[in-house]
């Protein structure tokens, strides 16, 4: 289709058709004195705006990253567009609801039901065409997404598997999803201790596990990626179709049983605003889930279907791991989940095997973009050593910037927050003191005392880090 894809041509076709019927319904609504037709015309206006947002956000999302300002590209543009469409439709529904309530208080008749019926029927036909078009777009998108997932991905070349953040003579290469740009991290000081550094394993370009049944596992485990942008546009078209149904029903009633000018308003005058209120409720019941889903993505919350407690329990069974901290799981877009975590790894054990087992755990949970930072822990050192505190070995350089960290010191361990019982021979309630680390007083009154998770009431000050130790 030339410079435009089939999806873009359909959006442009609906844009022109919707603009024409918006003008027609607006004029007919004022001439026929129909609140349903007027509300339906403004639904058409919302469709125009949603189509423009859908076209713009889709174009931006397809653009590749230009320069280093957008390391993830612009794939979230469609998420922002879907949220904008849903919020705008919600605000429009509130306005229509207020107008319908006022019309219930002061009912009015439809002056020209024949004109309203004709325009409403044509608007319903346009909306049915739009529903068929965008349902087809959603089906095509789902097929294309499944096709991309089943293609074998090219594995990046691997050199030295160990990377470093502040670790001498080590490097790690990471590829940002959606960008294809490799970033190499190199250490700068040769005099630092090995345990003060951190080894980074980045798998953000894709899962490098050579699993033979990956397509089947992906179909079963992975969350189906949905076109949020198309859902936002489809939601507007569905709401407009419901409005057209209300217009047609009201016009048919007044056309079959017309009211004379001298007759007072009866039950027929309440049909129009009553059905409008029902239409608003139906639209809002579909708009709120879309707002919630897009807001969860933009707030980088843990995606639905990911059980943090189960993941932590499985991570605790990996040999050689002493603690897990700085665990973050979020969605870049719908269906593409990213996880980052810090691992306290016991010195002398094989961390490559631990890395593979950790990535297998996330792989079976449907998380394939995993970044692991390993931190060495020497169990032979004294208990008062800093590295045995099970805190992060690569914090901020100075204590003044500790509050700017995503998990600042003094927060409760993940095991205390989610009540997850850990294994590997250590209690999740164990803690270690340090002169260098700040202390935080924790009130233990009212804490649950089951599964062995009890604290002494005489313990007044205790330092906890946002880590889970095993």
Swiss-Prot record:
Please verify whether the record's keywords include Ion transport: yes
Q: Which gene encodes it?
A: Slc30a10
Protein family = Belongs to the cation diffusion facilitator (CDF) transporter (TC 2.A.4) family. SLC30A subfamily.
- The segment annotated Disordered runs over 146-223, 451-470
InterPro entries cross-referenced by the UniProt entry: Cation_efflux (IPR002524), Cation_efflux_TMD_sf (IPR027469)
Q: Which domain of life is it from?
A: Eukaryota
Q: How does it assemble?
A: Forms homodimers. Forms heterodimers and high-molecular weight oligomers with SLC30A3, SLC30A2 and SLC30A4; heterodimerization is mediated by covalent-bound tyrosine residues, occurs probably in a tissue-specific manner and could mediate the intracellular zinc transport activity into early endosomes and recycling endosomes.
List the residue(s) that the UniProt entry marks as the site Important for coupling of manganese to calcium transport.
43
Q: Could you tell me which species this protein originates from? A: Mus musculus
The name this protein goes by in its record: Calcium/manganese antiporter SLC30A10
Cellular compartments annotated: Cell membrane; Golgi apparatus membrane; Recycling endosome membrane; Early endosome membrane
Q: Where is the composition biased (Basic and acidic residues)?
A: 458-470
User: Which Gene Ontology molecular-function terms are recorded?
Assistant: calcium:manganese antiporter activity; zinc ion transmembrane transporter activity
| Primary location recorded for the protein, binned into one broad class | membrane
Which regions of this chain are Cytoplasmic-facing, per the record's topological domains? Answer: 1-10, 56-81, 135-233, 292-470
Q: Where is there biased composition of kind Low complexity?
A: 171-184
Kindly list the residue ranges recorded as spanning the membrane.
11-31, 35-55, 82-102, 114-134, 234-254, 271-291
- The residue spans the entry assigns to the Extracellular side of the membrane are as follows 32-34, 103-113, 255-270
Q: Does the keyword Ion transport apply?
A: yes
| Physiological role | Calcium:manganese antiporter of the plasma membrane mediating the efflux of intracellular manganese coupled to an active extracellular calcium exchange. Required for intracellular manganese homeostasis, an essential cation for the function of several enzymes, including some crucially important for the metabolism of neurotransmitters and other neuronal metabolic pathways. Manganese can also be cytotoxic and induce oxidative stress, mitochondrial dysfunction and apoptosis.
List the Pfam families hit by this protein, alphabetically: Cation_efflux
Where is the segment annotated Required for plasma membrane localization? 300-470
